[in-house]
Amino acid sequence: MNNVFVMDHPLIQHKISLLRDKNTQTKEFRELVSEISMLMGYEVTRNMPLKEVEIETPVGVARTKVISGKKMGIVPILRAGLGMVDGMLKLLPMAKVGHIGLYRDPETLQPVEYYCKLPCDIAEREIVVLDPMLATGGSASAAIKYLKERGVTSIKLMCLIASLDGIKKINDEHPDVLIYCAAVDDKLNEHGYIIPGLGDAGDRLFGTK
């Protein structure tokens, strides 16, 4: 698998197991998604550029490093991607947040756009697209294409569980985009859901069916 980083940290793997459990209730599910997103955020931001600066401490001067380079942006794919935002903002409180609303047509399994609101300086930012489940890959690919059409040149995709089909679609259509996930499952069912997966992430986050 090209450009795919599967995070095997014990805390992430433990929390993913709890997410998969059908008995995990909405409140705990929501908390787990936020916690996993924050843990994954450490790896997604690992290669952020740094520059040396001098900082005056209470007792002297220290040469240390601060983040430089492009500012960050976070773009959740509505609605399930919203559950990942808070965890990322705990790491990146100054990041701007855009929203892309897509739903999957139940007949064709193709993405349908219904909402988009992005920061005016989106093209100047390094963007992390948030989508808990990379199933067919259609919605994520459409969101990435939408961002590129608006001048974004640096995009990463962060998801909790990815399918092999979804990974292939992103690799084929956006070979420049790095994919970060916590688990890879083999199959999709006839409705486009990842098997074994964790069910409908949006429904489990928001208590809907």
Swiss-Prot record:
Allosterically activated by GTP. Keywords: Allosteric enzyme, Glycosyltransferase, GTP-binding, Magnesium, Nucleotide-binding, Transferase. It catalyses: UMP + diphosphate = 5-phospho-alpha-D-ribose 1-diphosphate + uracil. Its cofactor is Mg(2+). Pathway: Pyrimidine metabolism; UMP biosynthesis via salvage pathway; UMP from uracil: step 1/1. GO terms for biological process: UMP salvage; uracil salvage. The keyword Nucleotide-binding applies. 5-phospho-alpha-D-ribose 1-diphosphate binds at R79, R104, D131, P132, M133, L134, A135, T136, G137, G138, S139, D200. InterPro entries: PRibTrfase_dom, PRTase-like, Upp_B, UPRTase/APRTase, Ura_phspho_trans. It is an enzyme of class 2 (transferase). It comes from the Bacteria. Its EC number is 2.4.2.9. Uracil binds at I194, G199, D200, A201. Pfam families: UPRTase (PF14681). GO terms for molecular function: GTP binding; magnesium ion binding; uracil phosphoribosyltransferase activity. Binds 1 Mg(2+) ion per subunit. The magnesium is bound as Mg-PRPP. Catalyzes the conversion of uracil and 5-phospho-alpha-D-ribose 1-diphosphate (PRPP) to UMP and diphosphate. Belongs to the UPRTase family. PANTHER family: ADENINE PHOSPHORIBOSYLTRANSFERASE, URACIL PHOSPHORIBOSYLTRANSFERASE, CHLOROPLASTIC. This is Uracil phosphoribosyltransferase. The lineage of its organism: Bacteria, Bacillati, Bacillota, Clostridia, Eubacteriales. The gene is upp.
